[in-house]
Structures are given as structure tokens and as C-alpha cells.
């Protein structure tokens, strides 16, 4: 199994967040956004859409969260 980037998860598939890389901590406001959105290590979610600009929409506890390409390429997840 192993991990992959959030952007590699197929629409309709579920995942568990494994790691938020340090690189994202240096983006102003991004870490707070991820924490408020429950996109934190150990949390489960499901990819519901991927837009042409690379934004990945995920369902976290019933809430739709749009994750930009920069973050979705770097957040590591595992399939559930």
C-alpha cells in the first residue's frame, strides 16, 4: 500500500491523512485552514471532485473542503 499525494486519489475513493509536510507550515494561513478543515494526520476523508485547475475537493466529516493544487500535491495520504 504505502502513501501517495492527495492529488493522486481517484474521485470516490476514501483516504486517511498520513502526513502534512513541513513545507506547508510556511504557507501563510494554510496550516490553520487544514486544521479547521480537519485535514490532519489520522483523519479520514473522501475525494469528491478534482477540478481542471488541480483543486481537489474532499469530504471531511460531511463538509466539502477545496484543497488547492499546491497543498494537494504535498499532503500524504493512504487508501482506506
Regions found by a protein language model. Name each.
Residues 1-71:
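Mid-protein regulatory/catalytic core that forms ligand/cofactor-binding pockets
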Residues 69-80:
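Glycine- and charge-enriched low-complexity intrinsically disordered segments
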Amino acid at each position: 500500500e504505502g502513501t501517495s499525494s492527495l492529488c493522486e486519489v481517484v474521485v470516490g475513493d476514501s483516504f486517511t491523512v498520513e502526513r502534512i509536510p513541513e513545507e506547508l507550515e510556511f504557507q501563510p494561513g494554510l496550516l490553520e485552514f487544514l486544521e479547521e478543515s480537519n485535514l490532519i494526520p489520522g483523519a479520514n476523508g473522501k475525494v469528491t471532485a478534482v477540478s481542471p485547475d488541480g483543486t481537489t475537493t474532499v469530504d471531511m466529516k460531511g463538509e466539502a473542503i477545496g484543497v488547492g493544487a499546491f497543498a494537494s500535491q504535498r499532503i500524504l495520504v493512504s487508501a482506506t
